[in-house]
Amino acid sequence: MSSHAPASSFSVSGLLAYCRAGFEKELAAEIDDLAADAGLIGYVRTEPGSGYAAFETFEPVPVIKLGEFADWRKPVFARQLLPWFDRIDDLPERDRARPLVDMVKGSGQRFSGVVLETPDTDEAKQRSGFCRRFTEPLTRELEKVGALRLGKPGFPVLHVMFPTATSAWLAAGLKDRCAPWPMGIPRLRMPSNAPSRSTLKLAEAIMTLLSDEERDSLLRAGMRAVDLGAAPGGWTWQLAQRGIRVTAIDNGPLRDTVMATEMVEHLKADGFTWRPQRPVDWMVCDMVEQPSRIASLMAEWIATGRCRHTIFNLKLPMKRRLEAVEQCRELIRKRLASIGPFDLRIKQLYHDREEVTAYLTLKK
C-alpha cells in the first residue's frame, strides 16, 4: 500500500480500548459486542488489572468498515477507543524507535501527530517519564521516513501504547472518533475554593458527555437547576460557577464556599420525594443509592417535564456491573417509551470509581 493512502483505506487489526483498572471484563464484553455489530470476526484479549482490552480480527480490515462502531463514546467503560494496526512484544532496550518506525512505515498510512501513552495502572504509569522523553526522537525518526506530517488535516494521530517496557500497541486516533485527551483522561485541576473533589466529577461529565456546542447552548448563565443530594455541595458549586441558579436539596449541610456564591438556595428535604414548583433547566444527582432507584427517579423527572436535562451518577454493585448499567437503560427506556425519543449517554469517567455517570434528555 502506498504511504499516501487515505485514512479510509487504511487496514487495521481490531479495536484497542483503555479503561479503569479492574473493569477490563466489562470493557471486553462491550467491545466484543461493538465488533460483532461492525461485522468483525475475531476475539477479545485482556488481562485483569491491565487497564485495557483489545479485539483482534482474524484478518486485517479496512478502517472504514469500523465506521460509527469505532466511536469512543459508545462503550460505557472505555476511556479511549482506537483502531489498532500492529503490536510488538520484544522491543529492544536501546533502539526502540527502529522497529516502531518500521511498523508504521509498513502500515502504508501517514499520521498527523504522535501520542505516547500507557495504561492507567500504578505499574504502567512508571513509564510516563519515558513516554515524554521518547516522543521527540520517535517523532523525528517518523518524519525522516515520511510517515509523519505534523498537523496535516485528514490524517489520523498515531497512538503508541506501552503496556510494558518491551511491548507496544500501535493505533490510529481518528478525528471526532477518539477521545481528545492522552490516555483518554481529561486534565482537570481542583479549584482551591471548591467544597469537595466531587466537583471534578461533574466538570468531567460536562466535558465528556456534552459536545462543545451543547456546553455553550445548554449551560447558560441565568438558567435554573436542582441538585438532589447536594451536600457538601461539589456539584452545586460547579453549576453556580457557570452562573446557574441552584436549588440544593439535602438534609445535610453545604460548605460555606457554596453559599458564598449567592447563587444557591439550600432546602433541607429528601431528594427522592421533593419536587420543584415549576420546571427547571437542569437536575443533577449524585446520591448514594441503588442504581435502579436513581435511574427510575431520573426518568420520572424527565418524563414529567420537571427538568429538561439531567446528569446523574449510578453507584454500581461489586458484581454484574455491566448488567446493572443495562438494567438502568431498560428502566429509563420503559418509562420514556410513551413520552418520545430520548438521548441517554453513559460513561465511566476518570473521576468515577465503582460508578458511572450519565446524561439524559428528550430529543427535540
Curated annotation (Swiss-Prot):
Binding site for S-adenosyl-L-methionine: S198, A231, P232, G233, G234, D250, D270, D286
Annotated localization: Cytoplasm
MF-aspect GO terms: S-adenosylmethionine-dependent methyltransferase activity
Keywords: Cytoplasm, Methyltransferase, rRNA processing, S-adenosyl-L-methionine, Transferase
Gene Ontology cellular-component annotations: cytoplasm
Active site: K315 (proton acceptor)
Protein name (record): Ribosomal RNA large subunit methyltransferase M
Gene behind the chain: rlmM
